[in-house]
């Protein structure tokens, strides 16, 4: 049985706010499901069909077939972008035929190339550490894909995916939470993203840049389940996708050197904080802040990447304690409801997926950027990564880290 839930919970910041969880698609509603061939989206498709929805499967095609095959096929499967895309599409189409529902392939190659591949390469070549998944979600998965679905005349009521996240809406004006003055007749009550039941699979960080307006029609049916429960339900229903490995990266490791082969990598100096040469790097796109392995230098103590200077083509190394930062500045923000807070406020900030959210003070700088000061120093703040502001597990905004504060 497919269970639907509605609940109210509280958080206390400056103002006690109630939040309501968005209801799932009603029986009879037209639902487009973003399908990848994995167990999550496959199960979502079936659950919605069982629930009585009119379901249409949609799969994006991003592989441009413009890269040479890697020397080894090992690791090609299990990534979002790769030459085996046709296998995934065929599996999705076959499953939809089995259910007796429509399936459409949406060409997103141009958008994917621009917003993911070009962005990924440009950021690394500028000495920054990009997050391609965060850029892909608003521009491709919840952007070009939905544009393509609508272009086919599919006027869906809801768009569902297999993401592990929850969608909520404040019961009062969002500005009250920040302590900002509430003016005008329009109430700011946007759709916002909250953690799912399975905290180990939580994907909210990756969704931080999807606009609230887009989220109005989005639903995440797996938000109330753990991954273990998802596998159990898939196995009970005999889904072949239950035996498929999860995708881990957006591109196979074997393709990393290939996608950067459009420009010759320029070796440069590896130096310490004093400027002393320690070795030679093989191209700055091979390095990221906090990296320890694969540096290619000999030392009697552990060394880490402190910073990357694209102008000097240098990789700077340091001791572990030199990675600590008191804060950061982030720009290019996407705030819930498009409302940028004016007041300073307390929140929790994640600076990478694997790190817990750190208690911080968030302050507007007057130029669209925000300064984040941590209560406790944080390690290895990497320009190019996303700083995501949470309050009680709910995303209020996400910005791109422009620099660290030491």
Language-model-derived ranges and their functions:
Residues 25, 36, 160-166, 171-406:
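AMP-forming adenylation/ATP pyrophosphatase catalytic core
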Residues 1-10:
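Hydrophobic alpha-helical signal peptides and transmembrane signal-/tail-anchor segments
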Residues 4, 22, 66, 336-338:
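Enriched - but not universal
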Residues 12-208, 235:
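ATP-dependent adenylation/nucleotidyltransferase module used to activate substrates
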